[in-house]
């Protein structure tokens, strides 16, 4: 099916983007899953919720992490199940700003969608920054060469 990427937005963006970066103490304010066919999947406040679109990649504004272990069928299944659902403002504030686990099954926010699509439990607990860290670590582990067992 081709390689899937986690795209992390680091551009200046809107006031909302800047507030997310400030609160999470991160350079990232948004994330998307980029499929091999060029579609970008996420939940976007600007687009009103869960959607697919094509975005012209500008590496000044986006960092990409390959996700070779991602299951495209699982991602598409979750997308089809949630496509058109609204943006989860309450869940975003409740799980990212307060120590609450709010899970609205009718709405999602960006990192919640991406984490759920990648199969992570408690997807609403992930910020774009935390999801990027976890995916980067999984990528490093899954692409590491075989260890020399004599040194184990």
Task: Describe every region a protein language model picked out.
Residues 6-67, 93-104:
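Glycine-rich catalytic cores of cysteine/serine-nucleophile enzymes that process amide/ester linkages
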Residues 35-39, 71, 118-121:
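Short glycine/proline-enriched coil/turn segments at helix->beta-strand junctions
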Residues 1-27, 128, 132-138, 149-152:
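Donor-binding and catalytic core of enzymes assembling or modifying cell-surface/extracellular glycoconjugates
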């Amino acid at each position: 099916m081709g390689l899937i990427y986690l795209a992390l937005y680091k551009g200046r963006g809107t006031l909302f983007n800047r507030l997310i970066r400030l609160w999470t103490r991160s350079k990232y304010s948004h994330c998307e899953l980029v499929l091999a066919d060029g579609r970008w999947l996420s939940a976007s406040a600007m687009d009103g919720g869960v959607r697919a679109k094509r975005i012209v990649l500008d590496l000044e504004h986006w960092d990409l992490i390959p996700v070779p272990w991602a299951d495209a069928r699982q991602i598409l299944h979750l997308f089809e199940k949630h496509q058109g659902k609204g943006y989860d403002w309450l869940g975003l504030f409740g799980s990212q700003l307060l120590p609450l686990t709010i899970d609205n099954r009718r709405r999602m926010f960006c990192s919640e969608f991406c984490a759920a699509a990648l199969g992570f439990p408690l997807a609403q607990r992930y910020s774009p920054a935390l999801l990027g860290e976890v995916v980067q670590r999984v990528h490093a582990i899954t692409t590491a060469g075989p260890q020399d067992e004599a040194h184990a």
